Each structure stands twice: as C-alpha cells, then as structure tokens.
UniProtKB/Swiss-Prot annotation:
Its EC number is 2.4.2.21. Belongs to the CobT family. This is Nicotinate-nucleotide--dimethylbenzimidazole phosphoribosyltransferase. The lineage of its organism: Bacteria, Pseudomonadati, Pseudomonadota, Gammaproteobacteria, Alteromonadales. It holds the Pfam family DBI_PRT. Pathway: Nucleoside biosynthesis; alpha-ribazole biosynthesis; alpha-ribazole from 5,6-dimethylbenzimidazole: step 1/2.
Length: 342
C-alpha cells in the first residue's frame, strides 16, 4: 500500500566525515550530530534544508470517552478545535514562535463543523465505537483514512514541503493509544495506561479496566496493523499513521509528537518498517509508557520537558533544533576551511 525506500546509506562515511571535520571536537554537538546525519541521509548530503514545513493537527472523538476515562467530556474536542482555529491554544502560540504554518483536520469529531473556516473535512465518522465494547471502526474506514492522509500529504509535497510535524486532539485518545501500545509491544494494558488529562486514582483504575477489556474482546482480531487500527484506533490515529507513511513515501521527514502520535508511529512501522528512517521524535512525553515506546522504536527524543499536552506541542518545539542541525551541517566551517591544524 505504501512504497517506501529506506534512507540511502551509500554516503554514510562521507556524511560522517563532513560532520567530524567541522571546527569542533568529535561528537561535541551530541544529538545534533546524529540529527544532522539523518537530515543528510534523507534530504541529500550536499545541503539538506528544511523547506516549507507544516504542522498537521488531526482531531477526532472516541467512544470510550463516554465511559469516564478523562476529566473532560467529548465536547472539549470540538471546543479545542475552535480554539485552534481562533489561534488561542498553546500550539498556536508555539507555531507563531517558531514560524510554522498549522492546519487543523477534522477526522471525526462528534459534531461536524460545517462551514468553519480553517477546518479541513476528512471525516470518517462521528466518533469511533467504544473500543471496550466494539471495534473502533471498520477496515474500510481504516483504508479510507490512510488514503485521505496520503492525499493531504501529496498536496503539501507538491507545494515543496519536505517536513511535516504531526499533532492531535481527541478526548479519550490516550486510552486508544495505550491499547495500541499494549498490543504492539505485547504488554498488559494496565502497564500502558497513564493519567492522560490528569485523572484521579479512581478514574485511572476505571481506564485501566476498560483498556484491558478492549484488549480481551478484540484479542483474536489483533493479527495485523490494519486490524489493530480498526479494533483499537482512533480516526485521528489512523490518519496520522497514513500521514507518516505517505510522507516517507515522498522522502519527507516526519516529526513525531508524544504518546498518541507515537502509537501511530508504532503501527506505521508495522505496516512498513522503512518509515522509521524518516521519523524524528520531538520529545519524550510525561505520559506513562512513552519512554517504553521510545525504547521499542530505538528512538532518542530531542526534548524532555515533562510535557503531556499533545496538539503537536513537542514536535513544534523541536523544530528549531532540527533547523540548527541543518544549519551547522551546511554552514559551519571545516578545519581546512578555517585554516586550523589539529
């Protein structure tokens, strides 16, 4: 379904030599050096540049939210989407700070926002099924969502974009992400469920129970990534998965945000392992389990700020570091350029 080539490692040694011969001690720029190498492998060894980057925020509602797994009701998803459009959310502020264009995609919130300027309609339904009682969606909806995301990424690719950051909004989506994590990593649901929006101990216990219930009733169907998405996913998680795969297919980099985005990344890697070469992990969330996801994907997040907001916040805040990595690779003098003998 997605034809993704691995990053071209033909020039590994040449790229590493260019980094090592900059006017600095070996390895002195730490993770920025690894990041610069990844940029060069994906975007080209001569002068990798970040061009026309975009943030895509995918929004949808989850049936499990009606069973009280969050401090907020599902209506908050719609309210936050309107806040995004008005420019008043944290993610809007961060995008303005780093100079990043943002778009909001309705993948399936409960009430359609017909005629609301600034919201892109890619609806797969009015919220998913409650995963502890039924499948989140059909396999047909999964395939449709993946293709919708591909079409959106293709549009940005045609406009010259070579990097996308991904964010989400959806009350109840940490439950879905925890269930996906448990399935992909072979863990118990109770060990993957965190406090999400900041729930109390009683709500946490209920959330853990419902995720375990979801894993139990769907156990026989969780045989491949598409069925994992159909049984346990969210409309926004499906479209984030598709966006990652489609971006990699077009040789674009992807900044993965936090817990929910990383759940999508785990499924994307199951669909096509080569997508991993194109992923940059913006931050390590404070949500329980995210550090284990990082280990599973052999990822080194750029930031550890104790955040658990979602929206793409960690991905956007990592963008200046990515630009800095490209900048030193392209502009920093080598020892020979500077006439320095060591």
């Amino acid at each position: 379904m997605f034809n993704i080539s691995p990053a071209n490692h033909e020039f590994d040694d040449e790229i590493q030599s260019k980094i090592d011969n900059k006017t600095k001690p070996l390895g002195a720029l730490g993770e920025l050096e690894n990041l610069a190498k990844q940029l060069a492998l994906v975007l080209g060894k001569d002068k990798p540049e970040i061009i026309n980057p975009k943030l895509l925020v995918f929004a949808a509602d989850h049936g499990i939210a009606s069973s009280g797994v969050s401090i907020a009701p599902s209506e908050v998803t719609t309210q936050m989407v309107m806040n995004f459009v008005a420019g008043g959310a944290a993610i809007n502020v961060f995008c303005r700070q780093v100079g990043l264009d943002m778009e909001v995609i309705d993948c399936g919130i409960l009430q359609p926002l017909e005629g609301v300027e600034g919201v892109i309609d890619q609806r797969l339904g009015a919220g998913t099924g409650a995963i502890h009682k039924q499948a989140a969606m059909t396999l047909g909806a999964v395939k449709q969502g993946l293709e919708m995301a591909r079409t959106r990424i293709e549009l940005h690719h045609q406009q010259g974009c070579n990097l996308i950051a991904l964010g989400e909004m959806g009350i109840g989506n940490t439950s879905s992400a925890a269930a996906i994590m448990a399935t992909v990593m072979g863990m118990k649901g109770v060990d993957c469920v965190g406090r999400g929006t900041g729930i109390d101990a009683a709500t946490l216990k209920r959330k853990q129970m419902l995720v375990e219930q979801a894993l139990h009733i769907h156990e026989a169907e969780l045989t491949d990534p598409y069925n994992i998405l159909a049984c346990l996913g969210g409309f926004e998680i499906v479209q984030m998965t598709g966006a990652m795969l489609a971006a990699a297919e077009r040789n674009m980099l992807v900044i993965v945000d936090g817990f929910i985005a990383t759940a999508a990344a785990m499924v994307a890697v199951q669909i096509n392992a080569n997508v991993r070469d194109y992923m940059i992990f913006g931050h390590q969330s404070d949500e329980r389990g995210h550090c284990l996801m990082m280990e599973h994907l052999q990822a080194r997040p750029l930031l550890r700020l104790g955040m658990r907001l979602g929206e793409g916040s960690g991905a956007v805040l990592a963008l200046p570091l990515i630009r800095a990595a490209a900048g030193f690779y392209n502009e920093m003098a080598s020892f020979s350029d500077a006439g320095i003998e060591i």
